Each structure stands twice: as structure tokens, then as C-alpha cells.
């Protein structure tokens, strides 16, 4: 069988909308177009009914009450609403927040903004495997700590933090616990009750739903309070004003309904693809998987190939849509801050590829990707004087390079 290229292996960036989801959305664009807040006629009632059905489907995936789901424009807005909203509401109790150095920018930049407003933030480091040390977390907690934010699944390296254990610590100390679950929903089981989570951010477009829609779970018992960040008509119980986009909400609801129904088979599919890929690149020397392989979402692999420059590798495998672990925008050639936090050196951080599988990925595509990467790595290393020196047994760290 011939594989159609380019092969999409960047499902952590975004996913295609599942055809079943797209079909469900279409009527809400043209026929059932009412405003869900219009409560004086059938157009509004029908739209509201569709929104509430979606709310229930989203709640079901994470074991929440539908009343605890607040619609937003995506996980970035959910992170902002959760962190700024809780910090500002509880600031009379204290102004200390805790998060992790490997969080998504939506959390880190929000924390930085709060620092500018006078809050104090502790950024926890991670161990070599990408997981935080729970003892270190406990030691960082102070009497004035009001919020802890830890992501469930890391977007770059896919590692799964011990969220239930952190939830236990927070509940014991009466600290608000926020979790960014954009990469977790539909990839690993998520249960806000079992994990004692207070605030949880979700996104539709990582789960085969449309872009531009997300949700924030806000616990009711024990009740968590937030200060709204968007003011207007008081929609979403006052947490988030703005007309609800019925078609997008219906899409998110259907995507989450399917994700709950097919979670087991999706996870088994991802595991199988991951094993095929790892077997396919087995023979390559100096290959490092970034992040813990056990505590990891099954659809994510982040691999560093020593003595190969990440950018040249991406160009060499142009038949694959993958992302480089480094921020390979032309303006920023900084290596990935997540990989640096694992203690990877600049060379390894620069030579990484993030390969993420999805529901639509086939075994043939993964086989093709592994073989292609294997052959290109060989070719790129043949061009590398560093590889030659390494093969000759020269310790590259001991060399004094001439300055220009």
C-alpha cells in the first residue's frame, strides 16, 4: 500500500474534526440558529436544549455535574479564567501560587501577569523523567498559598503527572487545585471527583472537535469561587459573558461523547502505533525518548536524535507533519524550555521531534514515518563532523573550540 503524504503526526497541535462531529454541527449553523439565551420563543429553546445536551456530554467524560461546566473560547481562556479568577477572588487569604516550569505558556504567562500584579509564584522544577517530586511540592506550600496549577498531560513530552496525589495534598490544605487537561481529555481517563480537582481546563480541538471552543470545570461542592474576566450579559452563571456559539458547543459535546465511548479503543490504537514506531527506530544509535515512558499519554512520543540538528531533520522529513521540540520559529532558535527543564543539553533539546498519533493515523503511516526518519538520520549524520568524531571515540566535551 502506498502512503499518501504528507503524513499528519502532529495531533497534539490540533486534530481534524471527526466527521460525525461535523455532521452534528451543520444544522445549528443554518436551521436551528437561535440564540440559546432567547427564552421567549422556540428558536432559543431549541438552541438552549442543544447546549445543555452538550454540557451533559462534556461533564460525563470527566465525571462532573453539567452545572459545573462553563463554556469558553478554548483552553487558553479557561486557564486564564481559572488562575486569574481564583487568584483575585482569594487574594485576601494569601498571594502565593505554585505551578511547574514545564506548564503550557497559557499557564506560565498568566502566572507572570499575576506576578506583575503583586502575587508571588513558585515554579517547581521536574525530575529527569518530567515528573514533579511530590515532596518538593509539599515543601513549597506556605500558609498563604491559595492556588496550585499542574497540567495532567504535558503537551510536548506527554508525561502524566500524579494528579490524584496532588489533589489529595491540595484538599488537605484547603488550596484551590487547577489542572490544564487540554491534552488529557480523550487520551487518558479523567475523573475530577476521584482526583479532587477544583478547576479543570478543556479544549475541543485536541479531541476531534472544532477550534475556538473550550470549557472550564468549576467545582460546586466544596464550592470554588472565581472573579469573572469577561463582563457582559452574565452568561454561564456570570463566569463568562458572551453569546454562546451553539454550533461549536454542539461540536464539542459530540466530540466528548465519542471520546468517552471510544476511549478504550483509542488508547489501545495509540499504544499499538507507539510500539510500531519505537520498534521501527530501534536500530538507530544515540536516540533518547524525552519524558517517562510509563507515566505517559499513549499518543505522544518526543524523541531526541543526537548529532542531528532539529531544524534540518524537520526539513529532511518533509513528508511528515511533525513538530520540532524546539521552538522552530525563525525568530526564536531557543531550545524547548520543557526539554531544558528535564536537564537535556542544548544539543539534545535542539535535535528532538514530537510525534503525536491520532484516531485517524494508520499502522502503515507510522511504519513509513519510522523508516523515513531512520534513513534520513543516517544521511544527516554522514554529513556531521561531530558524528564522525563521536564514532572515532573523541570526547566532544573535552574539545576546546577556537573562538571566532
UniProtKB/Swiss-Prot annotation:
Keyword Iron: yes
Catalytic residues identified in the record: 328
MF-aspect GO terms: 2 iron, 2 sulfur cluster binding; cysteine desulfurase activity; metal ion binding; pyridoxal phosphate binding
This enzyme's EC code(s): 2.8.1.7
One of the Pfam families matching this protein, by short name: Aminotran_5
Keyword entries, A-Z: 2Fe-2S, Cytoplasm, Iron, Iron-sulfur, Metal-binding, Pyridoxal phosphate, Transferase
Main location: cytoplasm
Pathway: Cofactor biosynthesis; iron-sulfur cluster biosynthesis
One GO cellular component term noted in the UniProt record for this chain: L-cysteine desulfurase complex
Binding site for [2Fe-2S] cluster: 328
Keyword DNA-binding: no
Sites where the protein binds pyridoxal 5'-phosphate: 75-76, 155, 183, 203-205, 243
Listed cofactors: pyridoxal 5'-phosphate
GO annotation, biological process: [2Fe-2S] cluster assembly
Protein task: Master enzyme that delivers sulfur to a number of partners involved in Fe-S cluster assembly, tRNA modification or cofactor biosynthesis. Catalyzes the removal of elemental sulfur atoms from cysteine to produce alanine. Functions as a sulfur delivery protein for Fe-S cluster synthesis onto IscU, an Fe-S scaffold assembly protein, as well as other S acceptor proteins.
Subunit field text: Homodimer. Forms a heterotetramer with IscU, interacts with other sulfur acceptors.
Family (UniProt): Belongs to the class-V pyridoxal-phosphate-dependent aminotransferase family. NifS/IscS subfamily.
Cross-referenced HAMAP family: Cys_desulf_IscS
Protein's UniProt name: Cysteine desulfurase IscS
Designated gene of the protein: iscS
Amino acid at each position: 500500500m502506498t502512503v499518501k503524504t504528507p503524513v499528519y503526526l502532529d495531533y497534539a497541535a490540533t486534530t481534524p474534526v471527526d466527521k460525525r462531529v461535523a455532521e452534528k454541527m451543520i444544522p445549528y449553523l443554518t436551521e436551528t440558529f437561535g440564540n440559546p439565551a432567547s427564552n421567549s420563543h422556540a428558536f432559543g429553546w431549541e438552541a438552549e436544549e442543544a447546549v445543555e445536551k452538550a454540557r451533559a456530554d462534556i461533564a460525563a467524560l470527566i465525571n462532573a455535574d453539567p452545572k459545573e461546566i462553563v463554556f469558553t473560547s478554548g483552553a487558553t481562556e479557561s486557564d486564564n479564567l481559572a488562575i486569574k479568577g481564583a487568584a483575585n477572588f482569594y487574594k485576601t487569604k494569601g498571594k502565593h501560587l505554585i505551578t511547574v516550569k514545564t506548564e503550557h505558556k497559557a499557564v506560565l504567562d498568566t502566572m507572570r501577569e499575576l506576578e506583575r500584579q503583586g502575587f508571588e509564584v513558585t515554579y517547581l522544577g521536574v525530575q529527569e523523567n518530567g515528573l514533579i517530586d511530590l515532596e518538593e511540592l509539599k515543601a513549597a506550600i506556605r500558609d498563604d498559598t491559595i492556588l496550585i496549577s499542574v497540567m495532567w498531560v504535558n503537551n510536548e513530552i506527554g508525561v502524566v503527572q500524579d494528579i490524584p496525589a496532588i489533589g489529595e495534598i491540595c484538599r488537605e490544605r484547603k488550596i484551590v487545585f487547577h489542572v490544564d487537561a487540554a491534552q488529557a481529555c480523550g487520551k487518558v481517563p479523567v475523573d475530577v471527583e476521584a482526583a479532587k480537582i477544583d478547576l479543570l481546563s478543556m479544549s475541543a480541538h485536541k479531541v476531534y472537535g472544532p477550534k475556538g471552543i473550550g470549557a472550564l470545570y468549576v467545582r460546586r461542592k466544596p464550592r470554588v469561587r472565581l472573579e469573572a474576566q469577561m463582563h457582559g450579559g452574565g452568561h454561564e452563571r456570570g463566569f463568562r459573558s458572551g453569546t454562546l456559539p451553539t454550533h461549536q458547543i454542539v461540536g464539542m459535546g459530540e466530540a466528548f461523547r465519542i471520546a468517552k465511548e471510544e476511549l478504550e479503543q483509542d488508547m489501545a490504537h495509540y499504544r499499538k502505533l507507539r510500539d510500531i514506531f519505537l520498534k521501527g527506530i530501534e536500530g538507530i544509535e544515540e536516540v533518547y525518548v524525552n519524558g517517562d515512558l510509563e507515566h505517559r499519554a499513549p499518543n505522544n512520543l518526543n524523541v531526541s536524535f543526537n548529532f542531528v540538528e532539529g531544524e534540518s531533520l524537520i526539513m529532511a522529513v518533509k513528508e511528515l507533519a511533525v513538530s520540532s521540540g524546539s521552538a522552530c520559529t525563525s525568530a526564536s532558535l531557543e531550545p524547548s524550555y520543557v526539554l531544558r527543564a528535564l536537564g537535556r543539553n542544548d544539543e539534545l533539546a535542539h535535535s528532538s521531534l514530537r510525534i503525536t498519533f491520532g484516531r485517524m493515523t494508520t499502522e502503515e503511516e507510522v511504519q513509513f514515518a519510522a523508516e523515513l526518519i531512520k534513513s534520513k538520520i543516517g544521511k544527516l549524520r554522514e554529513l556531521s563532523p561531530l558524528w564522525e568524531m563521536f564514532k572515532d571515540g573523541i570526547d566532544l566535551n573535552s574539545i576546546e573550540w577556537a573562538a571566532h
